[in-house]
């Protein structure tokens, strides 16, 4: 990993040198129309794996239109701009990471800071050092963060909104009291 000077300091660049060279050498013209002629709004663009609550996880098809629509809706909802930095600590095969985070950030022209896995110990450090402004949470993430010892720096951050599902009203209220006026978009 090597540092990449992002909008608020260094952000880990997970690409290796060979990949960097491939990207630099890639053609800049539009992808040939003949290669995309059969792609429609309904054509699957990615597979999202279910949680496996009724058996083994299953691959669910996600269309181009649905992915693009996710970004359109959430861009307006969270008022995303190119100045935002989205924080993604979820695996990219997870629906929230593959849709809400990526499509919204790309639609807005915003950056995405990736972490290999969620860390309660590193969360606020990452938010502060990388200028994170928008975060996608799931389930108990906010409760895990609330269970960390209070710090005088709890309100010293640029996180302006979080979007996700599974936040209880009690944790939601305690979250705002402790970490300040972070706008929460709870939904499914």
Report the location of each language-model feature.
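Gly/Ser/Thr-rich phosphate-binding loop
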Residues: 107, 129-137, 146-188
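Conserved AMP-binding/adenylation subdomain of ANL enzymes
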Residues: 68-85, 93-133, 148
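Conserved S/T- and glycine-rich ATP-binding loop of Class I adenylate-forming
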Residues: 44, 50-53, 86, 92, ...
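Conserved pre-ATP/AMP-binding loop-to-beta segment of ANL
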Residues: 26-49, 56, 79-85
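Short hydrophobic/charged patches on amphipathic alpha-helices used for structural packing
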Residues: 36, 121-124, 173
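ANL superfamily adenylate-forming
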Residues: 1-41
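Short beta-strand->loop structural element characteristic of the AMP-binding/adenylate-forming
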Residues: 1, 58-61, 88-89, 110-117, ...
């Amino acid at each position: 990993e090597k540092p990449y000077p992002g909008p608020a300091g260094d952000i880990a660049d997970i690409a290796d040198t060979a990949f960097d060279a491939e990207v630099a050498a890639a053609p800049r013209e539009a992808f040939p129309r003949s290669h995309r002629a059969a792609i429609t709004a309904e054509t699957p663009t990615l597979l999202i794996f279910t949680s496996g609550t009724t058996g083994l996880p299953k691959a669910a098809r996600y269309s181009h239109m649905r992915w693009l629509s996710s970004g359109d809706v959430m861009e307006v909802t969270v008022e995303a701009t190119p100045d935002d930095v989205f924080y993604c600590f979820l695996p990219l095969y997870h629906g929230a990471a593959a849709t809400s985070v990526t499509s919204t950030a790309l639609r807005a022209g915003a950056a995405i800071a990736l972490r290999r896995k969620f860390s309660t110990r590193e969360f606020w450090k990452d938010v502060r050092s990388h200028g994170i402004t928008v975060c996608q949470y799931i389930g108990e993430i906010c409760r895990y963060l609330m269970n960390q010892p209070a710090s005088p720096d709890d309100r010293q951050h640029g996180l302006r909104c979080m979007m996700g599902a599974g936040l209880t009203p009690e944790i939601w209220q305690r979250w705002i009291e402790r970490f300040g006026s972070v706008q929460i978009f709870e939904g499914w």
